[in-house]
Curated annotation (Swiss-Prot):
SUPFAM superfamilies: Restriction endonuclease-like
Family: Belongs to the UPF0102 family.
HAMAP family attached to this UniProt entry: UPF0102
Record protein name field: UPF0102 protein NE0719
Pfam families, alphabetized: UPF0102
Gene3D superfamilies listed in its UniProt record: 3.40.1350.10
Top-level taxon of origin: Bacteria
Coiled coil: none
Gene Ontology terms for molecular function: nucleic acid binding
Phylogenetic classification of the source organism: Bacteria, Pseudomonadati, Pseudomonadota, Betaproteobacteria, Nitrosomonadales
Native organism: Nitrosomonas europaea (strain ATCC 19718 / CIP 103999 / KCTC 2705 / NBRC 14298)
C-alpha cells in the first residue's frame, strides 16, 4: 500500500503527464519558498500556469475540489508572486487545478482558472 506522500507524488506525476499531453511545458515541480509550495509550474504559450494537484479517493467530504480552501488559495497566490519576482519579465499567469479521483481509475479533471488573485 502506498503512503500518502507516495500517492501525492504519483498524482503529481500523473497530472504533469496529462498537462504535457495537452501541450503545456513543465517548468518546475514542487516549488517551495517561505510562503508555501506549488505542485507544478507549467507554461502554456506565454502564460505561466500554477497548478494545484489534488487526489481524493472519495467524494465524502466534497472531493478534491473542495479541499482547495480560501486559505490554500491565498498561500498559492503568495508563493506564485514569490516565484514570479525571481524571474525577469512580465508574464501573464493563471491558477489551475488538476483533480484526480483515485476511486475512478484516476479520472482526471482539469480546471483552468480555478481561482484568481482577487
Amino acid at each position: 500500500m502506498s503512503s500518502a506522500g507516495n500517492k501525492g507524488s504519483d498524482a503529481e506525476q500523473c497530472a504533469a503527464a496529462f498537462l504535457q499531453q495537452q501541450k503545456l511545458t513543465l517548468l518546475e515541480k514542487n516549488y517551495r519558498c517561505r510562503f508555501g509550495e506549488i505542485d507544478l509550474i507549467m507554461r502554456e504559450d506565454d502564460t505561466v500556469v500554477f497548478v494545484e494537484v489534488r487526489m481524493r479517493s472519495s467524494d465524502r467530504f466534497g472531493g478534491a475540489a473542495a479541499s482547495i480552501t480560501a486559505a490554500k488559495q491565498s498561500r498559492l497566490i503568495r508563493t506564485a508572486r514569490h516565484y514570479l519576482a525571481g524571474h525577469e519579465g512580465d508574464f501573464p499567469c493563471r491558477f489551475d487545478a488538476v483533480l484526480i479521483s483515485g476511486n475512478r481509475e484516476n479520472e482526471i479533471e482539469w480546471i483552468r482558472n480555478a481561482f484568481d488573485e482577487s
